[in-house]
Curated annotation (Swiss-Prot):
Recorded GO CC terms: cytoplasm
Residues annotated as site: Stabilizes the basic form of H active site to accept a proton: 91
Top-level taxon of the source organism: Bacteria
Catalytic activity: an N-acyl-L-alpha-aminoacyl-tRNA + H2O = an N-acyl-L-amino acid + a tRNA + H(+)
Keywords: Cytoplasm, Hydrolase, RNA-binding, tRNA-binding
Enzyme Commission designation: 3.1.1.29
HAMAP family to which the protein is assigned, alphabetical: Pept_tRNA_hydro_bact
Binding-site residues for tRNA, renumbered to this chain: 14, 64, 66, 112
Main location, first listed in the record: cytoplasm
Protein name as catalogued: Peptidyl-tRNA hydrolase
Site entry: Discriminates between blocked and unblocked aminoacyl-tRNA: 9
Length: 185
């Protein structure tokens, strides 16, 4: 069994923003799998499905980004999931728009949702998919990540989100190493 978590902020105000691409991937994956992510438990909206015969929980923490780890820890404890069976999907300003970086483990970098997750789990040894949202040339970083994509970025992001869903499926079916070889970039 896997828990697949997309990081984001709850509420319509944040829908479609750079910081919510993790939620976007969960929504796209849920659509592909024919389920809805609408049950509330462990401070998260979630839905259950199967990928390649493997049970998966798709989840969107409702705690706001900086406290995402609380929800993830509760889910992992409830379902008795080891860190290697957790996949976290989130935005990364240090990766160019439209690119993916898949890793087996690693630091949180500047991402507060990942800092919370690593702190709550007391480990950074879990797979993650970083979705590039780029970095502003100038201006406030907070306004940038809470802003929408430009007209030119939208097609790149649609392709990136689709590749991220395929990456999740590949991790579950083929393992992290094959997924990294196939989808990094």
């Amino acid at each position: 069994m896997y828990i697949i978590v997309g990081l984001g902020n709850p509420g319509k105000k944040y829908s479609g923003t750079r910081h919510n691409v993790g939620f976007d991937v969960i929504d796209l994956l849920a659509h592909r799998l024919g389920i809805t992510v609408n049950k509330l438990k462990h401070k998260a909206l979630y839905g259950e499905a199967r990928i390649g015969g493997e049970k998966v929980i798709l989840a969107k923490p409702q705690t706001f980004m900086n406290l995402s780890g609380e929800s993830i820890r509760e889910m992992m404890q409830f379902y008795k999931i080891d860190p290697e069976n957790l996949i976290v999907i989130y935005d990364d300003i240090d990766v160019k728009v439209g690119s993916l970086r898949i890793r087996q483990s690693g630091s949180a970098g500047t991402h507060n949702g990942m800092k919370s997750t690593i702190y709550q789990l007391q480990t950074d040894a879990f797979p993650r998919i970083r979705i590039g949202v780029g970095r502003p040339e100038f201006g406030d970083l907070s306004n940038y990540v809470l802003g929408s994509f430009t007209k030119d970025e939208i097609p790149l992001m649609k392709e990136s989100l689709e590749r991220a869903t395929l990456t999740v499926e590949s991790i579950v079916i083929d393992g992290i190493d094959k997924a990294m070889n196939r989808y990094n970039g």
